[in-house]
Amino acid sequence: MQLEKMITEGSNTASAEIDRVSTLEMCRIINDEDKTVPPAVDRVLPDIAAAIDVIHAQVSGGGRLIYLGAGTSGRLGILDASECPPTYGVKPGLVVGLIAGGEYAIQHAVEGAEDSREGGVNDLKNINLTAQDVVVGIAASGRTPYVIAGLEYARQLGCRTVGISCNPGSAVSTTAEFAITPIVGAEVVTGSSRMKAGTAQKLVLNMLSTGLMIKSGKVFGNLMVDVVATNEKLHVRQVNIVKNATGCNAEQAEAALIACERNCKTAIVMVLKNLDAAEAKKRLDQHGGFIRQVLDKE
């Protein structure tokens, strides 16, 4: 696909005079364009749901979720991956973010990194990619060689693959087994795909990881019941989670959390089933960590 023919490289008529308007009008133009992103994501919800089901199946079988991208796309993958351990209590290696150019590229532009097909393959080899893993290639343009080569390598190994881009029929979309393609149109600043395209990608990644965690029993109701309390704010959140899930008061919630070494799931089952910490943990283990199953089946 030629660069000049890509939707993400097109000229946006709504912002053609943006350098001549007031600051407030400038903000209105940008905000109006941003409003078009959620509907674009809405149109690809079936594709996102299909990807979540595949990711969950692979992760349940011992695989990992691997994000692969360059520039803004790579940074968004790293952002999503880095939030999973504290929010859902998973091991840091379960969701992995890889960026063309390595860690230095998180804060700096690395010239030519996104054009390196070898880089995409080597980065996946360096994390010992296996057929159990799912590789999600992220590229607004859909033409990034680093991502395309990584997806090709992943498929050769037998991995399930997902391609996220904002141009229909792109190489990323056709290379991956599953394509998620929110069409957000031309950017306010021509070609600046960190804007609408980046926002769309962030929304999609939010759904992929959150959907995976919900289906993995990391959410009860709408509560993040595997949250790790790494600071005072999260200690308070744990207490509130147990309170909201059980109807107990703060003192009872804190006592239960202390008794089970601050594991929200165990504390919730302790309170709701009137069990000690050891028995509550045992029942959770018997049901794969799903609070709902403990409550519904016992």
Swiss-Prot record:
It holds the Pfam family GKRP_SIS_N. Homodimer. The active site is at E83 (proton donor), E114. Belongs to the GCKR-like family. MurNAc-6-P etherase subfamily. Pathway: Amino-sugar metabolism; 1,6-anhydro-N-acetylmuramate degradation; Amino-sugar metabolism; N-acetylmuramate degradation; Cell wall biogenesis; peptidoglycan recycling. The gene is murQ. Its EC number is 4.2.1.126. Specifically catalyzes the cleavage of the D-lactyl ether substituent of MurNAc 6-phosphate, producing GlcNAc 6-phosphate and D-lactate. Together with AnmK, is also required for the utilization of anhydro-N-acetylmuramic acid (anhMurNAc) either imported from the medium or derived from its own cell wall murein, and thus plays a role in cell wall recycling. Keywords: Carbohydrate metabolism, Lyase. The keyword Lyase applies. One of its GO terms (biological process) is amino sugar catabolic process. GO terms for molecular function: carbohydrate derivative binding; carbon-oxygen lyase activity; ether hydrolase activity. This is N-acetylmuramic acid 6-phosphate etherase. Induction: Induced by MurNAc 6-phosphate that releases the repressor MurR from the DNA. Repressed by MurR in the absence of MurNAc 6-phosphate. Residues 55-218 form the SIS domain. InterPro entries: Etherase_MurQ, Glucokinase_regulatory_CS, MURQ/GCKR, SIS_dom, SIS_dom_sf. It comes from the Bacteria. It catalyses: N-acetyl-D-muramate 6-phosphate + H2O = N-acetyl-D-glucosamine 6-phosphate + (R)-lactate. A lyase-type mechanism (elimination/hydration) is suggested for the cleavage of the lactyl ether bond of MurNAc 6-phosphate, with the formation of an alpha,beta-unsaturated aldehyde intermediate with (E)-stereochemistry, followed by the syn addition of water to give product.
